[in-house]
């Protein structure tokens, strides 16, 4: 990925899960909930559903050449994304897993004084809101773009074009930050947006240093 064109950036669009926080235990819980949903849907055992989903993800990834999302896997197996996210809302409890990180709070507050900040997530709005509140980041993002806005899961060119339109940012002005290149960053980069891959909190915290090179001091 190219170096960030600092002087052009006028807004930042963050992924949520795995980007603004990293919690393997909660990620595992999301996966387990999806397995339970598919097991109930198909009338099979948990272990069978888990293996079926793993095989399906591997097949889809091989045929497409890109890593496939949980939404894509469940849809391929006959699941309904609306029902899947309803199941998530009813069964997931992020408050039991996600810990607040004061370093991230300071970073996001600092960036919000210099850029409009937004969230673009494959999570649903109620769950995303609960996670943002748990992280202590409520009120710092101008807009939250979630999967239940139009039920177009990332990566999706139509959804991305709509986000750029709604934020009033040109591709060159919109920095996308995410932990999965194929899911969060590949399409924005194809649009001409600067992107930043962040898979750890330490990588996320480097944003302040990297963006200090833009025209206005950060």
Regions found by a protein language model. Give the residues of each.
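Asp-based, Mg2+/Mn2+-dependent phosphohydrolase catalytic module
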Residues: 1-12, 82, 105-109, 115-218
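N-terminal helical cap/lid subdomain that shapes the substrate entry/recognition surface
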Residues: 2-102
